[in-house]
Amino acid sequence: MSLKKKKILDEIIRVNHAGEFGAQQIYAGQIKFTKEPELKKTLNKIAEEEDEHLSYFEDLMIEKRVRPTLMSPLWKLGGFSLGAFTAILGKDYVMACTEAVETIIVDHYKSQIGQIEEIEIQKKIEKFLNDEAGHQLTGMNQIKNNDFKLKVFKKFIKIITKIAIKVSQKI
């Protein structure tokens, strides 16, 4: 593998690990602070899939000798806080957050597939992309009042997610 291709693969592994770590933190905050039993059940199911994704990228980081992002402490605090905040605001904000983050992640994973030469990694990312698309649909389908405030909130979350992706690739 050329140095350029190794650098690209390292960035993909690092950013995907960071994203799954951040998602895990968001769901942990939401699960801890939500008061709705059915919502908590849905979030636990999603969190289980995110745990599988995170575990895969943790193992891959060790195998490929890729360092994690230096932003992990910030992503831990920020993700958990975002999760707690949305849970306090209620189900629509929890689901809007899920929809917004997963919309960006689906596009992000799609953009990576053609850059990866290793078939096993490519297939895992395709599987995770399908999982994330399912989370995105769950979010979209469970929002009851998609008003102006919620639309602005989703736009804000999408911007933050894109920034986190760019930063995590490099730092």
Go through the PLM ranges and name each one.
Residues 1-171:
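Non-heme di-metal
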